[in-house]
Structures are given as C-alpha cells and as structure tokens.
UniProtKB/Swiss-Prot annotation:
EC number: 2.7.11.33, 2.7.4.28
Protein species of origin: Deinococcus radiodurans (strain ATCC 13939 / DSM 20539 / JCM 16871 / CCUG 27074 / LMG 4051 / NBRC 15346 / NCIMB 9279 / VKM B-1422 / R1)
Swiss-Prot/TrEMBL keywords: Kinase, Nucleotide-binding, Serine/threonine-protein kinase, Transferase
Disulfide bonds: none
Protein name listed in UniProt: Putative phosphoenolpyruvate synthase regulatory protein
Length: 277
C-alpha cells in the first residue's frame, strides 16, 4: 500500500497501444495478490516531451508519499532516458531481452521494423474498445435488441459478478459480452425471460453462494428485502433450477476471481467454435 492508504500506482507506458506492456505487467503482478494496485495507462508515449509529461505525473505522486511502478515496452532511447529519471521503479520490458536476442541471432534488432505488429496491436486495441462499448451498451439487461451481436450473454441474479466479467472479457479478450440480471418476475415462468429466448446457445449462467450474495448486497442496501438472506437463498435456488432445466453451462463465482470466471466463458466459446485459439 502506498501513501495515504491508496493503492499503489502502476504506470503502463508504451509508444503504441500499451496492450503488451499491460499484459506483461499484470502477469507479473498477479503473483502479489495482497498488493492493492491501480493502473494508469499512458499509450502513444513516443517522444521525450510525452515521456516528460509522464515523469511529471510520477513526481507529483511521489511528492504525496507514493512510489509508483512504471512498466514500459518503448524502444525509443529518449523516452527510456526520461522515464529512468522518474522517482519510481522502472521495468524496461524489452531492452535486455532484445540485447540477448541480438547475441543469439548475431545481428542487431530493427527497432523500426514493427509496422505489421504495430498495426495488429492497434487493431486489437480498437477491437477491445469496441467490445467495451458493446458491453456497456448491453449491461444489466439494457440493449437487449443487440443480443444477436453478442458472443456470450452472462445470466445470473443481481450481484453475482456479471458486469465485472463482461468488462474483463471485453478489455482483455475483445469479447462482446452482454449480461442479463434474473429478477423475481423471471422466476414466475418456466422458460427463459423473453429477451433471451432466441439466444439460448449464447447463455452462460453465473451462480453464487447465498451467504456471500447476502454479504455483498448488504453492503449496497443494508436492511432491505433485496439483501435479506431469505431473498438471496430464494433467488439463487430458482436461478440454479432454471440453469439445470435448460442445461446451461454454469460457473460458481463465490470464491472465483474475474479471471477464473472469464476462463470458463472462453473455454465454452472455444468448444462451440465461436473463438479460435
């Protein structure tokens, strides 16, 4: 934990979209689950002036008692030189590895030869931003007219983890994930809610332990019927019965991370042929 009880700032600095830098940073930092972190993305930092702007941000945070981390994949010497002056721990993710590869191949790296990869990176970035827009436009049961464009529709009771999973799938994998909250009215019918009827093949159920659900809802609406243990038990029981009756794939989110939930969704998409790789 950094100064003032705030999560430690993690700067993702790249001369392009920053997707590679962020993925590596997250892969490393996931091994320190007890560390609260907040990610600050600074893509397209391609010259010394832009790098100095990042350094100024870091200096301001350091002055308030924080010690940021900087992860960068830039190959621009002037950008790296500027970042190294920041009062932060800087992780240069490419330079040393490029030096080792230069020794293996007995030839210098062509630092300006990444055009094809840059284009692919930019396309991936745009795809993820489009998926994020779609997830927000079809969050929590809204935008059901667009369900035909969804890669997957997450279904479950309120506060079972649908929205975080939808956003994670969009941002990390470019998946168009919608989500639909099951409400009391939906449990009065034997079949699917009307907006979902023609999209059964896209549905993925999320369930949760009623006691955990009760704790989550109590934080939001203490003392309400919505948060009562009786209501939570009722909704989870009816939702589970619906999933079983329809034969839907289901993931228990009680103690699962967003990454673990998303992995289950991705496995389903691969099995159904809707996702390659």
């Amino acid at each position: 934990m950094s100064g003032w009880g705030m999560p430690r700032p993690v700067f993702i600095v790249s001369d392009h979209t920053g997707l590679t830098a962020e993925n590596i940073a997250r892969a490393l930092l996931t091994h320190f689950p007890g560390q609260p972190l907040r990610y600050l993305r600074r893509p397209f930092t391609s010259d010394a002036q832009a790098a100095q702007a990042v350094v100024s941000e870091v200096e301001a945070l350091a002055a308030s008692g924080e010690r940021p981390l900087i992860f960068t994949t830039t190959t621009q010497p002037d950008v790296l030189e500027a970042l190294q002056t920041a009062p932060a721990q800087v992780f240069d993710l490419l330079t040393e590895n490029l030096r080792l590869l230069e020794g293996e191949f007995a030839e210098p790296p062509q630092l300006g030869a990444g055009g094809h990869h840059d284009m692919q990176d930019s396309e991936a970035y745009l795809s993820r931003m489009e998926a994020l827009d779609f997830a927000l436009a079809t969050d929590d049961g809204i935008g059901d007219k667009q369900y035909g464009l969804s890669d997957v529709i997450l279904v479950g009771v309120s506060r079972a983890g649908k929205t975080p999973t939808s956003l994670f799938l969009a941002l990390q994998h470019g998946i168009r994930a919608s989500n639909y909250p099951l409400a009391e009215d939906d449990f009065e019918r034997e079949g699917l809610p009307a907006p979902l009827e023609q999209y059964r093949s896209k549905l993925f159920g999320l369930t949760i332990d009623p006691r955990r659900l009760h704790a989550i809802r109590t934080q939001r609406k203490p003392g309400s019927k919505y948060a009562s243990i009786e209501q939570c038990e009722y909704e989870v029981r009816r939702a589970s019965a619906l999933f079983a009756r329809l034969g839907l794939p289901v993931k228990d989110t009680t103690s699962a991370s967003v990454e673990e939930i998303a992995a289950g969704v991705l496995a389903l998409l691969r099995q159904s042929g809707r996702l390659e790789g």
